[in-house]
UniProtKB/Swiss-Prot annotation:
One of its GO terms (biological process) is translation. The lineage of its organism: Bacteria, Bacillati, Bacillota, Bacillota incertae sedis, Caldicellulosiruptorales. The keyword Ribonucleoprotein applies. InterPro entries: Ribosomal_bS16, Ribosomal_bS16_CS, Ribosomal_bS16_dom_sf. NCBIfam families: S16. Gene3D superfamilies: 3.30.1320.10. This is Small ribosomal subunit protein bS16. GO terms for cellular component: cytoplasm; small ribosomal subunit. Keywords: Ribonucleoprotein, Ribosomal protein. Belongs to the bacterial ribosomal protein bS16 family. One of its GO terms (molecular function) is structural constituent of ribosome.
Length: 81
C-alpha cells in the first residue's frame, strides 16, 4: 500500500480550504483517509497553515510520500527542511 500525504478539498464553491491528510495513493482526492494531520486555507492573507508536527513526522518516518504541494507546505510549517 503506497501512502501519500496530500490535500483534501473542503469548503464551498469558490471558497476552498484544504485538509492535509494521509491516504492510500489509489483512493480519490476526496475519498477515505487514514489520518488528518492539518489544514491549509489559501484565501486568508497570509495563507493559514496548521500542521500537527508530531503526526506529520510519524507518517514521514513510516514512509509516506508527500505530494509536491504538501512538501512545500510542510517546509513552510517547519516539519521538513
Amino acid at each position: 500500500m503506497a501512502v501519500r500525504i496530500r490535500l483534501k478539498r473542503m469548503g464551498a464553491k469558490n471558497n476552498p480550504f484544504y485538509r492535509i491528510v494521509v491516504a492510500d495513493s489509489r483512493t480519490p482526492r476526496d475519498g477515505k483517509t487514514i489520518d488528518e494531520i492539518g489544514y491549509y486555507n489559501p484565501l486568508k492573507n497570509p495563507a493559514d497553515i496548521k500542521v500537527d508536527v508530531e503526526k506529520a513526522k510519524k507518517w514521514l518516518s513510516y514512509g509516506a510520500q508527500p505530494t509536491d504541494t504538501v512538501k512545500i507546505l510542510l517546509k513552510k510549517a517547519g516539519v521538513i527542511e
